[in-house]
């Protein structure tokens, strides 16, 4: 049985690490848990999980944001499905779940960024999820 929920306890966060580490390969569990706690406390970050029976199969990390330019929206910071479960529609289910959360919260839209090399992900976002490409995201170390 498939079900989704927001993960709120440190135990649930630790349980999510093996899935998130498929996306965030540079993070060990200690760093992951420290950053996750900081994101929740400082940024109102939410971690949604898709379960197949009792096992986490996919994760979506999101946070509400507001900008002068676009107003209130939901930013998808992380989206990952464990490799053996890809192409089962789990990413779509989680993005739909996050979009429903945003709609109920009165937010105007959902946005995300995706690495330039992730061509399959880009097709998924545009062709299957209805996202449009509006900008590049730039980064500079300080």
From Swiss-Prot:
- Is the Glycosyltransferase keyword given for this protein? no
Recorded protein name is Uncharacterized N-acetyltransferase YhdJ
UniProt entry keywords in alphabetical sequence: Acyltransferase, Transferase
Q: Where is the N-acetyltransferase domain?
A: 2-142
The entry lists its GO molecular-function terms as: acyltransferase activity, transferring groups other than amino-acyl groups
UniProt cross-references to Gene3D superfamilies, sorted A to Z: 3.40.630.30
Please report a single Pfam family linked to this protein: Acetyltransf_1
């Amino acid at each position: 049985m498939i079900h989704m929920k927001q993960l709120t306890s440190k135990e649930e966060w630790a349980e999510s690490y093996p899935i998130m580490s498929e996306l965030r390969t540079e993070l060990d569990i200690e760093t992951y848990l420290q950053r996750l706690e900081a994101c929740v406390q400082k940024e109102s970050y939410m971690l949604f999980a898709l379960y197949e029976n009792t096992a986490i199969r996919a994760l979506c990390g999101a946070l509400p944001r507001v900008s002068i330019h676009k107003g209130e929206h939901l930013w998808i910071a992380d989206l990952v499905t464990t490799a053996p479960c890809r192409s089962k529609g789990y990413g779509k289910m989680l993005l739909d779940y996050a979009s429903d959360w945003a709609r109920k919260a009165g937010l105007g839209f959902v946005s995300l960024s995706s690495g330039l090399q992730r061509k399959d992900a880009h097709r998924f976002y545009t062709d299957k999820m209805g996202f449009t490409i509006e900008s590049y995201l730039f980064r500079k170390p300080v």
